[in-house]
Amino acid sequence: MASASLDRLFHPRSVAVFGSVKRGKIGHQLLTQLVEGGFPGALLAVNPRAEAPEGLPSVPAFAALKPSAQPVDLALVAVPAPFVNEVILSCGAAGVPFAVVLTSGFAEAGHVEEERALARAACQAGVRLIGPNCAGIMNTASRLYASIEVRALPGRTAFLTQSGAVGGAVLGLARERGIGFSTFVSYGNRADIDEAELLEYLSEDPQTGVIGLYLESLSDGREFLRTVQRVTRRKPVVIIKAGRSGSGLRAAGSHTGALAGSDAVFQAMVQQSGAVRVPGMEEMLDLCEGFTRLAPLAGSRVVIVTNSGGPGILTADRAEELGLEVPPTPETVRAALREFLPAHCALANPIDLTVEGTRENYSRALRAALAGEGFDAAVAINVATPFLDSVALAEGILEAASELEGAEGGRVQGGPAQPTAKGSARAPKPLAAVFMAGEIVVEASRRLKDGGVPVLPTGERAAAVLAGLRDYYRHRERPGGELPPDPDPETLSLAADGPVLEPDLVDFLEAEGFPFPPHAYARSERQALEAAGRLGFPLVLKAVSPRILHKSDAGGVVLGLRSLQAVRRAYAAMRGRLEGQDLRGVMLYRQVEGAVEMIAGVKRDPAFGPVVLVGAGGLFTELLRDACLRIAPFEREEALRMIGSLRAARLLQGYRGSPARDRGALADLLARLARLASRYPAIRELDFNPVFVLERGALIGDVRLLV
């Protein structure tokens, strides 16, 4: 849908409010917000008795809305739920293109069919809907405050929220911190317009520099991923996702299912999309302010300039936990610092100016650190006391930012700009401030914000902002686009109710190009001995039974068989152990030695479809929980990034003298698995555990399928 399609929603020429306009009612609150917010267009109150709103003499009242010379672009609906459809149909008859339905009592209260009827009525009437069960919308450029929440300050952040209460809390917190918004949308139950359509529109809105989003659920996860992938190529998206706890996970029938819980899948979507996820409201405001005020971050090396050692160390610790670097101060910078800092100041990074640090110390230290090539960003920390002039220290930081901007021929602050052109001599560098100690730093903090420098309450939160910038700009530089279109679904010939037997599954997967060690299926001892003679030794013997899910736990796997006699004994012992387990025979494999064991698998998520997993494999899969997920399909480059994100990647690179293993072969297997899962929607879960990664090639050691 074209981005211009929502223009009249956010830039209406006139607004009609449906519902009671008595003081204290939602209709009256909406009109009060619009009048006091300075909405420049026409306002109308519509209710059956044509009651005029108390205390708002400029707003005319009507018993019904009729087509007129003054068209209405937006209806705000705050009538009881049984009357909403009637209002929407009347809006359609009057040519109103948009309605925001604040009324509750629909799907959120269990009345799903009533909400479907509302959506049908809106479609019939040609009216696009926000809501129901929402808190309204705002657009500060249009002075449209069509919401029951506190009016937003003007700014360059757009905020979309499923929860009206969370939206109100964010607006209140932002107002306390002086953070403004371009657009606010509480979209509630999204009976029509959803977060994906709003994101597309805001991605092209010139008033919006960054988009914040509070989510509780998604109606179409795959389409949402594609949308966010497109949007983040143009501007940052910062997401809060509720429901991270283990109570949202289901019981799983495979290793992949156990590792790929619902929140883990959502996190994979975030990483794949280029969005940045934060845990809560304050962190979202931190990062949105960072994106609107800070220059793009070109690297990960951070210098910390502080007047107190403890907060500097805490900041450094958190920065490194988040994958940022806090490298030693280069000798060239140390030499410059020695020219003006007292001998007792620590220069290592953090650079500790001590409590005696002055305006000049901050200004010159920041300029010395950021002027060269040793650092990509800075955090300036001031732990104030009643005896320090924090305003003067703030002026020193602003002075450094201003002079660096002029010296580098570009803005030190002011993101989110387009990516810095490759080959430019100097890139702008982010500079964030941390001013602590409550009331005594209020004026200093205000001056910093007015000068374009964001102020965070702790160094740890400043580090999180820089890490968020790093993640976003690093992802935006990667080649590649959105999730490919889903292939036409194919029927799985193995489809059955329950586990598929290993011999059939291996034959199917080999035909699809997946590699296995030399193997054979034997239904009797004689067949097992004949197969062993053909395959050679050592061998692995594995039970084939529809009742056994984890073979090693049940005694259904025997390793290291090096003779026909050993195979005969193992076969007889296995039949005895598994009596009554519906043993259908055994699989024999040539045993793979000298490999790194990994796991690869796929799980079908209800919101995002097929999700591929790679991680540390073998016996320690769920113990170590070292795994990475991606939504399928994807290609080899994405698979290589997945592998590189694992702690187990060090084993593949060659560890303590061991040879490097074939990461490329593992990546090819993952990409092939992603394509397979996309073609066969009947696959619910598929495990390859272990996958033996060799110096050349990779082989699947065990496989399990649920359909």
Q: Positions of the model-derived regions?
A:
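Catalytic-core regions of core metabolic enzymes
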Residues: 1-707
